[in-house]
Amino acid sequence: MHLSADISSALQQIEAVKKGIDESDDPKLQMQTAESLSTILGILQDPVFRTIVHVQDSLSELNAQLAQHPSMLPNDFDIDVAGNLVLSLNGGEVMYDFDEQRSSSHSHSAPGSPDKSGGVGEEPRPQSQNSKGAGVADLYATDYAQIQAIELVNDGTGLGFGIIGARNSGVIVKTILPGGVADKDGRLRSGDHILQIGDVNLHEMVSEQVAAVLRQSGTHVRLVVARPVEQSVPTPQYALEPGTAVVPTRVLVDPAELERYLISTGYPEIFGESSTASTPQTTTEDDRFVYRGETSMLIDPNIDLEELLALPETEKLQVELKKDANGLGITIAGYVCEKEELSGIFVKSVSPGSAADLSGRIRVNDRIIEVDGQSLQGYSNHQAVELLKKSGQVVNLRLERYLRGPKFEQLQQAIAANDKLPSSAPGTPSRAPMPTPVATTSSATTTPSRSITRELEEEALPAPEAFMTTPPSVTTMTTTTLSSFGAGKQLVAVRDSLDGSTKIIPTEVVPLADKTEAKNSGVITRHKYYTDPELSDDAETEIIRKWQKIVGSDVEVIVAQIKKFAVGGLGISLEGTVDVEGGREVRPHHYIRSILPDGPVGVNGVLRSGDELLEVNGERLLGMNHLEVVAILKELPLDVRMVCGRNRNSSLLPFSDDTLKKLSNNFENLLPATDRLVKAKSDGSLATAGSVADGDSVAAAAASFSKLKSRSLEPLTGLAMWSSQPQIIELVKGDRGLGFSILDYQDPLDPNDTLIVIRSLVPGGVAQLDGRLIPGDRLLFVNSINLENASLDQAVQALKGASKGVVRIGVAKPLPMTDNSLKACSNASTTSEETLDAQPSPPALPTVAPPAMPPSASMGAEPDLIPDWRN
């Protein structure tokens, strides 16, 4: 029972109690209860309170609808100013949920007159078996009604009309949306009584049942409506539209009697065969997506209506497949709906005779939810392919199958629309004409409606034998055929950027060179960073000439054509640097810090540590953000063309552990510690202090490094282990902070933990003037806050949260590392940094050499983000 009905019942009970007390002879009781009863009655009768209760009832009804139809979206419902629940069904039909209690309260209204709640007023009548049906006849003020069958085709925007429903009066068309499907068709009118949808008669249906019927109606919706005839007795000259008939109003009470009357008068097609559709039906779609006239919207009349309401829209199933020589034998595609409610990885086709086909449990349009217990939520198509590729011989798939409802319709229309896109059949030989590249920028040209899903990203996976000859081939709108997920098979990814827009990214197609690939598709889709596998002399000369103009004659331009291994990256670690102007980081540069000898770059042998990355596969890296550079390097295809700059000045030694160790040993004692271990942030040239040491070697070293721009030189130490004895340093914190910056560092003894390390000192700052704190010190605590294994954010908050005045800082001093310890800690990786003061940077203090850095992480598989050691 609705809350409003409960309140009405309570109101009646309280009024009865009040009446009984008023009629009693107990003045004391009357005096004690009069005020309370009046207050309660005033609240229960208050119009605002009743409206709130009505809204609450609408929300309860909405919850019930959501439980039955989980695919409902925010745009599918609303609550009007009267508090009524408004449901937008099937993309556009609107149903106003009618409250019978409100209907009875307006029973004094004239028949057919709309009340303020949007319902239809009715006169009180004796309850009988046919009382509900009699209400239908009472809607008409004439003795005759016109019956018409109308078929509308939902174009994806809805049918464009609104309805109101009451239990006794049936379903009435309330509004016609201008420009909608019904408005363009012109046959449906406001005030029409809807008698039937498809083969389902709406006699005595409640709103929930009508909602279920509308949700099952599909794309082609056939309505049988009745409207009053203005003339009391129709004459032969009465103009009837095609597919219409005039019947006595009394026969509308009984659907069976109405049908018999129509048959006897020569109009059997109104309740039988479909009328002419208002929109031409297309027949070019794949058979499984063809809407078969009215049969696509019919519901088995033998199904109980209560059972119909409980039918689920989806079902989930678990399937175990064993790979054969051809893999799984399914093709997948990624879809994203505009409403963002229908998205994921779907089965697009099943290869005959494959493991998936023989299982008999996988169907086209099934959505893959999990692979071996791993959820695919948020996975791109490429990531899903990778996961399936890495699965074992036996694969457990969890699938979701759409059986009915809006998502089912949207998925059918989406795949049908995609099937219309130009593509090359699998059997097309390589000499077939090339299709025009797809470059669609609006949903109107890619899908038949605004709510249709779009295929945003697909991947290509060749058949096993394709690896022995030419590059894999796929269709223009490439799909992922999971038929070669065998051991040792290589996945060549066709990765286009996936954004949230409505466009399909244009692809470039090239012909196959070998007719033996005819059983695959006739075209391939190039990788977005594709480059020619061979470097011609002319191409190399042109690249060098272009970059020589940019970097100048002091830099040698090196071009390397590299072939990546089937698994892994380039085998380099990367270092990013910037210049600092006015406290802002400008002019980013990217250097090769180290090269794995047996990696692709190391085997190629052209590039060296210290070379600056300028371009890769035609993509300019100079001036690009460091994170973007790392992302590009990780996405490169097998063929890589790297353009680097190498300083012709021989005094600039390449970055290597041996070189940095020698530099550290040679120059470590040239300057006092307070001058050596300072981060320089100046834009000027670096100069050495002439008063520190004499000799030709010092002068030569100073001259060689005086030409370097400031790169925020870092501590001259390669330390990665610290003393077990903490040292307490007290610094006086002022308005400009403590004068040092920190970074988090992977614990060499436990890769899961991080350490906080002093990164650099601000020249002239508190820490630098004190002289006891040096870069490389491990931060243990600040005042009473333990930071031994704290995160960077926690350390920053502890330092910034320290009050002005004396701050007690506990540090562990670094210990010198042996060669063995260096190797043991080669996996340590610096990840991020924070500067803990806003003090303007003064001119750089004298310093002489590039830093010796802690060894970077992963010297092989992928480029690493090494923080700005030479800033």
From Swiss-Prot:
GO CC annotation: adherens junction; apical cortex; apical plasma membrane; apicolateral plasma membrane; cytoplasm; nuclear envelope; plasma membrane; septate junction
Stretches with biased composition (Pro residues): 840-854
Tissues in which the UniProt entry reports expression: Expressed in primary and some secondary epithelial cells such as ectodermal cells, salivary glands, foregut, hindgut and invaginating tracheal cells. Also expressed in specific cells of the peripheral nervous system. Expressed in the germline.
Main location: membrane
Residue stretches of biased makeup (Polar residues): 822-833
Statement: the UniProt record of this protein carries the keyword Isomerase: no
Organism domain of life: Eukaryota
Residue ranges of every copy of the PDZ domain listed in the record: 149-229, 318-403, 559-648, 728-814
Biased composition (Low complexity): 437-451
InterPro entries per record: L27_dom, PDZ, PDZ_scaffold, PDZ_sf
Subcellular location: Membrane
Subunit structure: Component of the SAC complex, a complex composed of crb, Patj and sdt. Interacts directly with nrx via its third and fourth PDZ domains. Interacts directly with par-6, possibly mediating a link between the SAC complex and the par-6 complex, which is composed of par-6, baz and aPKC.
Family of the protein in this entry: Belongs to the Patj family.
Reported function: Involved in cell polarity establishment. Probably participates in the assembly, positioning and maintenance of adherens junctions via its interaction with the SAC complex.
Protein name as annotated: Patj homolog
Organism: Drosophila melanogaster (Fruit fly)
Gene from which this protein is expressed: Patj
